[in-house]
Amino acid sequence: MTNKVQILSVTALGNLDAYIRIANLWPMLSIKEEKLLTKRLRYHDDLDAAKTLILSHLRFVIHISRNYSGYGLLQADLIQEGNIGLMKAVRRFNPDIGVRLVSFAVHWIKSEIHEYVLRNWRIVKVATTKSQRKLFFNLRKNKKRLGWFNQEEIEIVARELGVSSEDVREMESRMSAQDITFNPFPEEDLKDGKINGNMFYLQDKTSNFANGLEQDNWNKHTTSKLSNALLRLDERSRNIIRARWLDKKEKNTLQKIANNYGISAERVRQLEKNAMKKLKIAIEN
């Protein structure tokens, strides 16, 4: 796919800010739109569908790339690597498995960025085993202060990451070395420890990016449907719902609203109940 589908490129634009602005202009896909496009790609090899899927997910690659800003590498390069992972994910995604594409793609995006960081950071052969790679990406986020870990902190990190205390101390020493220059480790040196971006992916236990994005998308979707549903109500019913449920400062009482409209509190309750039924139907449809 990477040879056939041309997508937005940081290099082509020559400006990272311009790239980010343009990437964010592409509309996000609804569940229905995404499913239609992924099926067109999977069952009909529709490259136009693939292009739309990729372009609509570029913003997620940008978001993920920012988590790797502490390694001294250009964000533009991290984004390009993440885009490769995104394209691989789009090609391999099965629309029938019941999850959103972004949930599936996070693994591939992080995997490509991880491999790029490991190959291009300043330390020679800083992480050649699975436990070392895990430490490489997680060690600095576990540091609560500058300086070396004490023994208690070493044991805590080792326990949380499932590695030995000796591995933690060795990796801390490697990452603290200032006089070691970069020299990408050759493939023949890795042997069984070869980094495989398609198979290895470090989980960030502090957050779930995919779930967060899906929740954010759902919140925006629900808010939009609620706004449209409110417009279908008459003005008085709309104002009652807003006063009772949408006022951020306070929830108005039935009696206060009744006084404003010169009607009984019971009548306000009836209007509120009817309006809520109409909103429920409008949102569900």
Curated annotation (Swiss-Prot):
Q: Could you cite one Gene Ontology molecular function of this protein?
A: sigma factor activity
Q: Which InterPro entries match?
A: RNA_pol_sigma-70_dom (IPR014284), RNA_pol_sigma70 (IPR000943), RNA_pol_sigma70_r2 (IPR007627), RNA_pol_sigma70_r4 (IPR007630), RNA_pol_sigma_r2 (IPR013325), RNA_pol_sigma_r3/r4-like (IPR013324), RNA_pol_sigma_RpoH_proteobac (IPR012759), Sigma-70_Factor (IPR050813)
Q: Where is this motif: Interaction with polymerase core subunit RpoC?
A: 77-80
Record-linked Gene3D superfamilies: 1.20.120.1810, 1.20.140.160
Keyword terms = Cytoplasm, DNA-binding, Sigma factor, Stress response, Transcription, Transcription regulation
Q: What does this protein do?
A: Sigma factors are initiation factors that promote the attachment of RNA polymerase to specific initiation sites and are then released. This sigma factor is involved in regulation of expression of heat shock genes.
Signal peptide feature range: none
**PANTHER family per the record?**
RNA POLYMERASE SIGMA FACTOR RPOH, SIGMA FACTOR RPOH HEAT SHOCK RELATED
- Region feature (Sigma-70 factor domain-2): 53-122
Query: What does the UniProt entry say about where the protein is found?
Result: Cytoplasm
Task: Give GO BP annotations, semicolon-separated.
Answer: DNA-templated transcription initiation; response to heat
Q: Which residues bind DNA?
A: 254-273
Annotated Gene Ontology cellular component terms: cytoplasm
Q: How does it assemble?
A: Interacts with the RNA polymerase core enzyme.
Stretch list, region Sigma-70 factor domain-4: 229-281
Protein name as annotated: RNA polymerase sigma factor RpoH
Assigned protein family: Belongs to the sigma-70 factor family. RpoH subfamily.
Alphabetical list of CDD domains matching this protein: Sigma70_r4 (cd06171)
Q: Do you know which NCBIfam families this protein is assigned to?
A: PRK06596.1, rpoH_proteo, sigma70-ECF
